[in-house]
Amino acid sequence: MRVSKYLLSTQKETPANAEVISHQLMLRAGMIRRNASGLYSYLPTGLRVLRKVEAIVREEMNKAGAIEILMPMVQPADLWVETGRWDKFGPELLRFKDRHNRDFVLGPTHEEVITDLIRKEVSSYKQLPLNLYQIQTKFRDEVRPRFGMMRSREFLMKDAYSFHLDVDTMNETYEAMYTAYSNILSRMGLAFRPVLADTGSIGGSMSHEFHVLAQSGEDLIAYSTGSDYAANIEKAESPMPTEPRGAATEALRLVDTPNAKTIAELVEQFGLDITKTVKTLIVKGATEAAPLVALIVRGDHELNEVKADKLDLVASPLEMAPEALIRDAIGAGPGSLGPVGLNMPIIIDHSVSVMSDFAAGANVDDKHYFGINWERDLPLAQAADIRNVVEGEPTPDGLGTYAMARGIEVGHIFQLGTNYSKSMNATVLDENGKSQVLLMGCYGVGVSRIVAAAIEQNFDDRGIVWPEAIAPFSVGILPMNMHKSHRVTDIAEQLYKDLSAAGIEVLLDDRKERPGVMFADMELIGIPHTVVIGDRNIDAGVFEYKNRRTGEKQDIPFDQLVDFLKNAVKS
């Protein structure tokens, strides 16, 4: 491709409204342009990268035995009514009526459509298992689209759905998808981690997320320093205490604490060890008999809201009780709450169950109890894992300790079970002629999100540093002053033909432009390999080669360059 016949559209200045580096660089590199909030057009450079990501995803899905189909973006509302998600989904589900006053949605996902398709097309166990996938545009009407392609309203996604009669084949397909996703991200040259994940509102028995590691990632990943164990912070298991509860050495005493509204203030003012304090949070309960529930974690720990949401006594979704309701029930406000004398169900974290001589609010404003001990001052409460893990703690497999990294979720695989097939009556006849509800798996990859995540992991102060497999072009040719030198023009044109004939994707900058601008554009759009041609190089019989990632420069003889670049691109 010649730049003179290409829509390069680079920008020197960073757009003011672009918050994250991927959004900034996709705009500056001429990859995308905004049409409306959360809606973007792909320009040629962006589309080339998107198509390369899409091709790798498609190849690995096909290799794993999945079959490609294509479902409509517009979906009839009656399918969503059938599963109950018409009412459960919030305003992010874009609903509209056609000219006949029939309800439709712009699909944010395709569970309903695929289940409807399978219940009509599959009737016998002999047709199973099946794993069908598509690469299709999705739409979610986000209240505040942010971060460019990282959280846009319209996006490209690969979603696959598998159907089974038995758990064994569902597990086999799940493992195949796990491997396929790992292969996809490995082929793209991205550092990533598969992590155990919460199944969330979708439910199901097993779930993994695939995260591209990046300091800008919204998700916190807890992983083992000694094994492959990794989990989303919401799912990571806290270790059980190994030390027994210490004996009581202090008397229970009521202390005035007028200026200690937080644990940090309490610790600072009274010289306490933060591990000898607890935080009490009041949430709404799941029953009329217990409308409020107290959740208690150690002062240096944080409540894990996803874990808390799964407690039987706690209302789901988890909702913190408002201060007015707390005061009405307890007589004190947040900052002065604790377990002693508290007349409601109490659930403590396992780490709290082994505490002794600890401090907590006294359920009277501006007062705390010091020297609290279980089974002396109050009964030992129900204990559960309700906190976030902490770096340095042992991991559940016993093979290492927790370390933390930030990640961007680009893939998610679920075992759905019968969540959708049961509500939509998707059944087949088994080998005994008996009707059986289908088991389902669901496997999603954010194709357009991978593009943004790759940039978040691969950039420097000059622009994008693409991994080889998804770069828009492999080689950039920079002829210096080619419009003034026939020698430079002739050699640049010949090199362009030779590299193209070798199957290498080349961008030849044939503009009448200053060398500084040409270099800046090549580095901004992230082409992995650049070749500079000038009269001085020609006199020496060499090309000047530069590697975008390492910055390494070297002179390569004319007759060796094509083979050198073939090897560089392959590696």
From Swiss-Prot:
PROSITE patterns: AA_TRNA_LIGASE_II. Keywords: Aminoacyl-tRNA synthetase, ATP-binding, Cytoplasm, Ligase, Nucleotide-binding, Protein biosynthesis. InterPro entries: aa-tRNA-synt_IIb (IPR002314), aa-tRNA-synth_II (IPR006195), aa-tRNA-synth_II/BPL/LPL (IPR045864), Anticodon-bd (IPR004154), Anticodon-bd_dom_sf (IPR036621), Pro-tRNA-ligase_IIa (IPR002316), Pro-tRNA-synth_IIa_bac-type (IPR004500), Pro-tRNA-Synthase_IIa_type1 (IPR023717). One of its GO terms (biological process) is prolyl-tRNA aminoacylation. It catalyses: tRNA(Pro) + L-proline + ATP = L-prolyl-tRNA(Pro) + AMP + diphosphate. Coiled coil: none annotated. This is Proline--tRNA ligase. It comes from Shewanella putrefaciens (strain CN-32 / ATCC BAA-453). The lineage of its organism: Bacteria, Pseudomonadati, Pseudomonadota, Gammaproteobacteria, Alteromonadales. The gene is proS.
